[in-house]
From Swiss-Prot:
Biased composition (Polar residues): 346-361
Region of interest called Disordered, as start-end residue ranges on this chain: 338-369, 550-570
Species for this entry: Caenorhabditis elegans
Entry protein name: Serine/threonine-protein kinase flr-4
Membrane-protein topology: Multi-pass membrane protein
Entry function: Probable serine-threonine protein kinase involved in the control of defecation rhythms. Required to increase the length of defecation cycle period. Acts in a cell-functional rather than developmental aspect in the regulation of defecation rhythms. Prevents preferential activation of the p38 MAPK pathway in response to the levels of vitamin B12 in different food types during larval development, thereby regulating the expression of cytoprotective genes, modulating life span and stress tolerance.
Signal peptide (from-to): none
Family per similarity comment: Belongs to the protein kinase superfamily. Ser/Thr protein kinase family.
Keyword Transmembrane appears in the UniProt entry: yes
Length: 570
């Protein structure tokens, strides 16, 4: 109990120390410091994220978004005061920079300031009542024209940030961080400053937690960041081209209501393992990021934009300035081709004029993946007549054959299910066997350790250790020893899992790289060598053609309050 009390005292002291540092480094005369919140009135909660709660407050005649930073994220015994202090300095430096530049550009959400006292820390920013693009996607499907408009306005915001001195890298471009103004324009929000303040320097257990928070966000991360030694959780792994890649993923999200390849993962927990595995694999396999895979039913204009953004090499990926020019050129060429099409197909009668006008209006803001052509009523009637005639001309099928087909179909499904059930039972029995064996080993080791200690005591003091009080003490020691061994094993497994997920095992002095040739034991390949892996990859297509493993309602992904609201600025 004294140990827990001391640890809790250290943890509480750290968060209190953070507020004291804030109070010292933001004096009352600082333009970034909000001296008092007496004029603020709480209205409602907007959502809750990993690093705090976002609320709506009124300040006089205006509304503001207030982020209440959850200071318990610093209450961990692995935190170092020096590291937290250094991260706080970085946080204040970047926030001051953003506080200055956001007021000079109408494409960036305004950062109004920070309030801090001895108990709490608030971050104030501009409030936009229409929410984010992600909120809009929950309610409706965006047309191509709207998605391109939002894309261009986001490019303008990034162009401004990337050309500052020093440049500002957003690092978290996605639909949830694109806020919509009252005049249907985009403002860029959520620069992840609080996340950076909390993440760096965490212990293994906390770092694993943070990595899991990036599950869905990894779908927006550029390949060079995924394959870097620092990993996607480290802010230093991001350069300017990473924002361009994330912008392309956000464009796909606006068109399809989901980021690229989201529908191919059976569960969201699979995302880090699969993406990081492909990013650092040596067999040449990559996920396809081409227009024909991501948006095959979209217009030619959208497909050109998608192929323009998703260039794997960051050196060849266009910057914001080139991207603006090339997208405008694509749009201009597309409008010219539409005009030429209209001229080459003159209107012959009023009925054609009406249908052409309707078709043109719908094509301007078409939905990707939906039919954009309306057939005349006459064509629909003729199609119905042909379908009825075709149905009548079909011969009657053999009922006995249909019974055999249906029986075989359902029997195959039953056998498949029984196969899965059998394997599940075997895995369960194997898991129980390994668990019981491991626990038995821990208990046996603990027993022999305590037995050895009792033997040493008996030799030195000639005591009768078979008395009840000594037996009770020995039993307690066995339990404590067992718990200690089990805890050490769980910590080791947690660190191993973290290093596997982040591909950092090669940093260990005990790391042994994959051999060039495969290791074969009794005719069974136990380790696949690098050469065999490359040969296998050459026999396959360079890109993976994925088949959806699960069909789900993607609106559930968008209606996730735990991921934070649209107005969350940090």
């Amino acid at each position: 109990m004294p140990i827990n009390y001391n640890r809790n005292a250290v943890e509480l002291k750290l968060s209190s120390q953070l507020l004291q540092w804030l109070d010292q480094r933001l004096p009352l005369g600082d333009p970034m410091r909000i001296p008092s919140i007496d004029s603020y009135k709480y209205i409602q909660d907007l959502g809750k994220g990993r690093f705090g709660t976002v609320c709506k407050f009124s300040n006089g005649n205006t509304f503001e978004t207030v982020k209440k930073v959850d200071l318990t994220i610093f209450n961990h015994w692995t935190q170092s005061e020096t590291k937290v202090s250094n991260r706080l300095d970085t946080f204040l430096y970047e926030f001051r920079h953003l506080h200055k530049v956001t007021n000079d550009n109408n494409r960036i959400v305004n950062f109004l300031g920070i309030y801090a006292d001895s108990n709490q820390m608030y971050i104030m920013s501009e409030y936009l009542p229409r929410g984010s693009v992600k909120d809009l996607l929950v309610k409706e499907t965006l047309g191509e024209d709207t998605a391109i408009k939002y894309l261009m306005e986001t490019v303008e915001a990034l162009d401004y940030l990337h050309n500052l001195s020093p440049p500002v890298i957003h690092r978290d471009i996605k639909a949830a961080n694109l806020l919509i103004t009252s005049n249907d324009s985009i403002k860029l929000a959520n620069f992840g400053l609080v996340r950076d303040l909390a993440v760096d320097g965490f212990g293994i257990a906390i770092a694993s937690e943070i990595t899991l928070d990036f599950r869905a966000t990894l779908l927006y991360v550029a390949p060079e960041v995924l394959s870097s030694a620092l990993g996607p959780g480290n802010r230093n792994a991001y350069e300017l081209p990473a924002d361009i890649w994330a912008l392309g993923c956000t464009f796909i999200e606006m068109l399809l209501k989901r980021p690229p390849h989201f529908e191919y993962f059976g569960h969201i927990d699979e995302i880090p393992k699969v993406l990081l595995g492909y990013a650092k694999s040596e067999d040449g396999k990559v996920l396809p990021y081409t227009s024909e895979v991501l948006v095959p039913s979209s217009s030619n204009c959208v497909q050109k934009i998608v192929d323009l953004v998703f260039i794997k090499s960051p050196e060849h990926r266009p910057n914001t300035h080139k991207l603006r020019i090339q997208i405008k050129k694509i749009l201009d060429d597309d409008s010219e081709s539409e005009e030429e099409t209209d001229i080459s197909h003159p209107i012959s009668n009023s009925n054609t004029d009406s249908s052409t006008a309707i078709s043109h209006n719908h094509s301007n803001d078409r939905k990707v993946g939906r039919a954009g052509t309306c057939l005349p009523i006459e064509s629909m009637e003729y199609a119905a007549v042909r379908k009825e005639l075709k149905k009548r001309s079909k011969p009657k099928s053999n009922n006995i054959m249909q019974i055999f087909v249906a029986s075989g179909y359902y029997l195959s499904r039953i056998l498949y299910f029984l196969n899965i059930l059998t394997r599940s039972i075997c895995y369960l029995l194997l898991f129980l066997s390994l668990g019981i064996t491991a626990l038995g080993s821990f208990l046996l080791i603990s027993y022999f350790v305590v037995r050895f200690v009792r033997y040493l005591i008996a030799i030195n003091c000639n005591c009768d250790l078979m008395q009840p009080q000594y037996l009770i003490i020995s039993g307690i020691l066995i339990v404590l020893m067992f718990a200690l061994l089990f805890s050490c094993c769980m910590v080791a497994l947690g660190e191993y899992k973290f290093r596997m997920a982040n591909q950092t095992l090669d940093g260990s002095k005990f790391y042994l790289p994959r051999p060039q040739k495969s290791a074969v034991l009794c005719g069974i390949t136990v380790i696949t060598g690098k050469e065999d892996a490359k040969d296998t990859a050459q026999n396959m297509e360079e890109e993976i053609h994925l088949t959806p493993s699960v069909r789900r309602n993607h609106d559930d992904y968008y209606y996730d309050e735990s991921s934070g609201p649209a107005n969350e600025e940090n």
